[in-house]
Regions:
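Conserved GNAT acetyl-CoA-binding A-motif
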Residues: 109-122
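Conserved acetyl-CoA binding element of GNAT-fold acetyltransferases
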Residues: 80-91, 119-120
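Conserved GNAT-fold acetyl-CoA-binding loop/helix
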Residues: 25-47
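Conserved catalytic-core motifs of GNAT/GCN5-like acyltransferases
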Residues: 119-120, 128, 133-156
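A short helix-loop-beta-strand connector motif used in the catalytic cores of GNAT acetyltransferases and
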Residues: 42-60, 69, 159
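Conserved acetyl-CoA-binding loop-helix of GNAT-fold acetyltransferases
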Residues: 89, 95-108, 133
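A short beta-loop-alpha structural element at the N-terminal edge
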Residues: 4-18
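Conserved beta-strand in the GNAT
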Residues: 58-60, 66-75, 83, 88
Length: 170
């Protein structure tokens, strides 16, 4: 079946934010236990920042007629150094090869891309395996307490403020 990217409509944004929180919480809860506040996983502000960024394109992902996930991509049409800001596949679809098909479809949708970039938490072993071993990314940087992301406020991060930066040169 083909992968289809359907642009998000305003009325779909609450469901998109809820999906992101629910799916991103799986590894957080497995690693650290239940958080005191759901914003400890990913805040609405962070999701909204991506959704409202004029460089970002936001989609629901379908395989045929079935919704299987969502994505927010930051597309820089000047440099073609693009970023996957948010990408999720529904957990019941994990392990089926769908993620690889989705990533290939993203690459095909933006063939001018020179470099793809994304950031994922250090404890997300499933993501690390997927991006490195299945999609051909490499880890190029590690943000942590001693090496902070230049755009992130130290007060905005908490105990799990360690992230890998991945890149894939096309």
């Amino acid at each position: 079946m083909s992968i289809i990217f359907k642009p998000l409509e305003q009325k779909e944004l609450p469901e998109f934010r809820a999906d992101v929180k629910r799916i991103f919480s799986i590894a957080v809860i497995a690693t650290f236990g239940e958080p005191e506040n759901e914003d400890d996983i990913i805040s609405d502000d962070i999701v909204n920042e991506s959704l409202q960024n004029p460089l970002c394109e936001s989609f629901s992902i379908y395989e045929g007629r079935e919704k299987v996930g969502g994505v927010v991509l930051k597309i820089d049409r000047d440099t073609w150094h693009n970023e996957a800001e948010i990408l999720y596949i529904y957990p019941e679809k994990h392990g089926s090869g769908l993620g690889q098909r989705v990533w290939r479809a993203i690459e095909q949708k933006y063939p001018q891309t020179k470099v793809w970039r994304l950031i994922t938490p250090y404890f997300e072993k499933r993501n690390i395996h997927f991006y490195v071993n299945k999609c051909g990314f490499r880890i190029v940087e590690f943000f942590n307490k001693a090496h902070r992301h230049p755009e992130w406020s130290p007060s905005a991060l908490d105990f799990h403020d360690e992230f890998f930066v991945f890149e894939k040169v096309m």
